[in-house]
């Protein structure tokens, strides 16, 4: 009787997954873990406790099953000790992925490594993972000689052939073979690590977040070497498998009927109470590729699957891999929802739909809506002039593309790759090159042209990727590194490619008010964000206005807004931040006067100002508002930057918008009713849509409310009113995190964010602001900690390559804002569904008052020319107690034309002064030297929370009394009493009477090294400037200390103030200190004032012969 042919199954089909929860103690007490690389074995399961089934969710694994992964982390190749460490690292529930041992994969690690597999296969990848884990604890050996740059004992252990044979015969080598005539082998790792060896657990868990220097490189020689036993055994078929514990083959037969049971989610609970279509989520296709780098799949306590993006520290319900397989809405079946959509059944609002990707809500079913639009706008007939080209049909298969494929390699410059892209709004839309920027890398390469479809980036097919995903891929490539791209030529640009909304898409997106703009964003400046203009959400799209965490106004349809904005033509203004680089002859452009300010007259050398265009109006230079400066003043501001400085320039491009071209929110109800044509007369206005997912129904899994309360109670229970707390996650760049830390000089002094370094990580992120109070660093509260302790926490974060900051930001009231918010108070949500009172559009308040910086520069024989008034009584929460009481005619404050009586001052030189006393503020301004930066909120924008009647509107501003007279008390100003003081109205104080600054500065004591203290100075009285750190010597005491940075101002040297002293005197003070020097430093911005003097005359290293 002939035996029926059976289909051989890969061991992958036998992999099973289970969840371990409710243990309470050590999970290893429930399931014994045996094996380990030190024994030449995979980790595998040993004895099990009798009650193990009560703690397992899913199928209970058997004794002897090979352990492959723990919570998605591969443990093959780890030692027994490290495997236990990985298991104990995770909180419950713990997911275990195991496989029954067979002929290919079993306990024998040496056997598996000896097999040859096809490159790119599952087994080949698993072998590489095993080697990566082995190299954390062991070092491969070879009989060849060391090559240039290789370090014995680090890259390889270089041994003789005799030694190698001895190791092989003793069974110490897990794998061995020959490559290029030399022997290579991988020894077993020791059971216990070297006491000086780093703990590899974090590298195993978050491999991509560590520097490549700390990871052992994969050895090509070991991967490609010829092994003595490399024949691949056939895996046994399903029907031949032996019965376990007396069970028959029926179970196996059942497993065979259900494909890929190992890949199903465990447990199979409903993912949500809503009707979100998770059919594609519950079964994982074997052909589905692995999760993107630094992504992880996890379970909630209820067993629901969610995904963690370790790149951004965010979570989502959406499987990022399924985005590529998403169908267009019109192609979905009845009852099916497009990728990223969710159906909500709400008892008050009825049924509505949430688009988690675009973060919008609507009442219409998106599938039915798309099919209805498709029927109303059928495909053009053959006789239509604008016939759709045959080759424009979208595909995710590169082999199906119509056109010529081309390959190119571009080197990333400081301005990116030199081309802009468009598309990727929908899953079925190509991403195409829109423009090739002149003189950029793409233009110099000469291969890329507008319309080219981006097919592949560094080996990753991006057909079907979203615009944001591709932009992020380009952003992750470091400057001066290359990108390899495959493009397809033969597809026309879309018809709306000249749409101004679509035109602001760049490979390196423009930065608008600190936020990067991406495809589909509507670009508007702060001038448009006033009363009556549609508010834009955090992505620049029209939506619900949020003030102090509350929702006001309806959600407008994004597509309608896109159409209305696009109809405004090319005159739509846009604010764009362009990074400039100062060359030997300047920035490469000329400016001229215009009614709107200084505008670009011509481009002289575009390599220093790429992206700048003729006619651009300059708004800010390095975050300094220059709109009201004269032509000469703007030229002087640009001249102060040294050659090689990178300067962000904020420009206004395009003409001012016509009032008829900007969609307004009518304050008059009758106007509003008349402007909505779709509503019949007498029909009530529809209720505003519920919260979008980013406000009420988060697109991320929520923690248990009690858990959130417990975690936050200790830190935030004394949170002051009118403040908001936010978390900011930053990744470290080469220059650090991009901000300075102030405060912490005393136990009661708070820690604040100081200067935001231009083009640094914090500025690129855009969420952190100067004067934010620092609450936590990576979950560690900093209240009561010293400045040094905070720096130590930041140093530890720098070692990890990222930091999570919790900051507290003061919220300042605008006119009538509090009353409006009280009228529109929103009840709390019930059962996860939002509740929203019916409100009229006219009730939308203005945005919180916009603060702006004013930089004042004075001469030695004059003061800054303004008087600060401070409230004697403690004002209500949200009111800034310091305001301008007088501006002296002809003074720097008067000449700048930006300060007026009544303006509130919230910060000085980036340091919040809201909680400071008047004397401290005056001293802070005195110690600023000849330049001070004030953060101002205009008087008409800041009125504080209203209370009954506001007498400030009925009473004139108090006149400042002449010097020498009694300081009066004004009881009519905002109903508070104020005292007026002169702040720097007269000449600068002599050096002897100048007091050391205690707020915002920090002391640093250095011991002289063999070559001095390791820093150089610039400035002094003879150069009409203060003293600044110019350079830091490599391996010098200053750079080793870690607190001194280029651009920091020296306030004191050995307890002697530097106000008004010469450069020579500063050197003498340092010499007088002997082997030590004590410096009091004020954090700078990283830039050093340059008054066009020769650098050699402004700086000198402090060397031993000078001391």
UniProtKB/Swiss-Prot annotation:
Q: What is its main location?
A: membrane
> From start to end residue, where is composition biased (Basic and acidic residues)?
251-261
Q: What InterPro entries does the entry give?
A: GK/Ca_channel_bsu, Guanylate_kin-like_dom, Guanylate_kinase_CS, P-loop_NTPase, PDZ, PDZ_sf, WW_dom, WW_dom_sf
Q: Where is the composition biased (Acidic residues)?
A: 232-241
Annotated binding of ATP, by residue? 117-124
Q: Where is this region: Disordered?
A: 210-277, 374-398, 941-975
Keywords, A to Z, come to: ATP-binding, Cell junction, Cell membrane, Membrane, Nucleotide-binding, Repeat, Tight junction
Q: Which domain of life is it from?
A: Eukaryota
Q: What does this protein do?
A: Acts as a scaffolding protein at cell-cell junctions, thereby regulating various cellular and signaling processes.
Q: Which family does it belong to?
A: Belongs to the MAGUK family.
Which protein is depicted? Answer: Membrane-associated guanylate kinase, WW and PDZ domain-containing protein 3
Gene that encodes it = magi3
